[in-house]
Every structure is written in structure tokens, then in C-alpha cells.
């Protein structure tokens, strides 16, 4: 009895596999026939059907074939719009952004124009890499999304654009923070030059990200870097740089009176005063 049951189950599974294989082979054969067909209307209908069923690769292939043929026709609008999405859903975000922008530029009076303009920027956002990689595409995405918000301030897509902008700016902030720390950490190799570079990066960071979660740490490191730079400076520059360290400290304490870096900052302040006293004797 057990063996008979196993045989029935195996036979049923074989039938299912055979049926699936047949359907798959038939579907592939139908798609290949469509690719070779000269009937653009048939291709158009099939492409729309594939798209609506989530078969974006097949939809993309057929749309690519017919877009030059239907250019200027009524069907060109929806075909071009879907074409952008076929790339987006296949995670080819740079191509998607290109075709969404092309759609907006070509069909700027379309009912899909607003969405296409948003998707141009959002596709660039999706292509944005981790913060530790080059952020050129993130900057491009920020420009595109901010441009969308400026054009369509009341759009239903604005909240999603705002969220993407926040994430992109956080990446740029983290990238700038890590870059500043890198220069500071390299001081052990070429102390003076890297300290100067770190101070420039600290200053740039504060200008670009005034409300950053890293602002307090950067302001403290600025004090420390200036003090260390004073230590390794030639005699004629020492006093000036110790005075700058003191100024950085005073500005820091005014802003962060209860900072976790307060004790360290005070120590640098006191050491700077002592060094100036010695230099004045």
C-alpha cells in the first residue's frame, strides 16, 4: 500500500513537471514568434500584457522593437512610459532614469509627466551607492528630486521625494565626516600637512552640514587639530595657532556647554594658555 501511494505521488509530480515544462516551452516559443513578427500592433498588445503580468524583460524587448515604429502615434505615450518602468523593475536604474527623463521631455503635457519626472530622480536615488563609495550619482539624484519638488510642490510623490532626499543627504554627510576623519588620522604620517587638510575638511563639513549629528565631534576635533598643528609649527606661527585653538574652544563651549568632550577640550584650552605663557617669557 505504501509503495503504491509513493508511485501515485511520483506519477502525479511527473505529470505536473511535464505540464509545467510544456507550458514554459510554449510560452518561450510564443515570445520568440512575437519577436520575429512584423505585426507591430500584435507586439504592442503583447508588450502591454507582459508588462501588466510583471514580465518586464519580455515587455522591454518588444517595446524596444516597436518604439521607433509607433513614434508620433497615440500609443507611443504609454509605450514610452512603460518602457522606463521595465528598466526600473529590472533594477537597471540608470537606464530607467534616462528613459523617464526622455519621456518627461517629450510628453511634458501627458498625464504621466509628473510621475515620470519624479521617477527620473527616484531612479537615480535607487542607483545611489553606499556612503563610502563615490557619491556623484547621489548629488545628481538630489538635484533631480529637488527639481521635481520645485516643479510639483503639491504632488502626491513629494513625501517619497523628501524621504529619498533625506537618505541621500545623510550619505553625503557620512561621506564628508569619514573624509574629515581620514585626513585627521593621517596626521601621524605627514603631521603638519594632514592637520591643515583636516582643518579644511572640518570647516567644510560645518558649512555643508550645520545641523549634523557629527557636528559636536567635528567641532571638538577642530580644537584638537589646531592645538596639534601649533605644536608642530615653526616658532613664528606657534602663538597664533595656540590662540586659534583657544578661540575654537570658546566657540565650542558656547555651543556645547555640557559636551561629552568638555574635559578634553578644557585640557587643550589650559595647555594652550600655558604654551602661550611660555612663548611670552
Q: Where do the language-model regions lie?
A:
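Acidic, polar-rich low-complexity tracts and alpha-helical solenoid repeat scaffolds
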Residues: 2-4, 8-11, 24-281
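Bacterial N-terminal signal peptides
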Residues: 16-25
Amino acid at each position: 500500500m505504501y509503495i503504491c501511494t509513493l508511485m501515485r505521488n511520483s506519477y502525479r509530480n511527473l505529470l505536473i513537471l511535464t505540464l509545467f515544462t510544456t507550458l514554459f516551452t510554449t510560452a518561450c516559443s510564443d515570445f520568440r514568434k512575437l519577436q520575429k513578427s512584423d505585426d507591430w500592433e500584435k507586439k504592442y498588445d503583447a508588450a502591454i500584457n507582459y508588462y501588466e503580468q510583471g514580465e518586464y524583460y519580455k515587455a522591454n524587448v518588444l517595446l524596444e522593437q516597436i518604439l521607433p515604429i509607433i513614434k508620433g502615434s497615440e500609443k507611443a505615450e504609454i509605450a514610452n512610459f512603460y518602457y522606463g518602468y521595465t528598466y526600473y523593475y529590472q533594477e537597471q536604474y540608470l537606464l530607467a532614469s534616462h528613459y523617464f527623463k526622455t519621456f518627461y521631455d517629450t510628453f511634458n503635457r501627458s498625464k504621466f509627466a509628473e510621475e515620470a519626472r519624479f521617477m527620473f530622480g527616484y531612479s537615480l536615488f535607487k542607483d545611489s551607492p553606499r556612503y563610502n563609495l563615490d557619491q556623484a550619482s547621489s548629488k545628481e539624484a538630489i538635484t533631480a528630486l529637488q527639481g521635481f519638488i520645485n516643479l510639483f510642490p503639491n504632488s502626491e510623490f513629494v513625501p517619497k521625494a523628501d524621504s529619498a532626499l533625506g537618505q541621500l543627504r545623510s550619505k553625503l554627510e557620512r561621506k564628508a565626516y569619514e573624509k574629515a576623519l581620514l585626513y585627521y588620522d593621517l596626521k601621524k604620517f605627514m603631521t603638519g600637512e594632514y592637520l591643515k587638510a583636516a582643518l579644511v575638511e572640518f570647516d567644510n563639513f560645518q558649512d555643508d552640514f550645520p545641523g549634523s549629528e557629527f557636528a559636536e565631534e567635528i567641532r571638538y576635533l577642530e580644537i584638537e587639530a589646531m592645538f596639534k598643528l601649533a605644536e608642530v609649527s615653526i616658532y613664528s606661527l606657534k602663538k597664533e595657532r595656540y590662540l586659534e585653538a583657544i578661540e575654537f574652544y570658546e566657540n565650542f563651549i558656547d555651543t556645547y556647554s555640557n559636551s561629552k568632550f568638555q574635559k578634553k577640550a578644557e585640557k587643550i584650552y589650559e595647555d594652550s594658555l600655558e604654551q602661550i605663557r611660555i612663548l611670552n617669557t
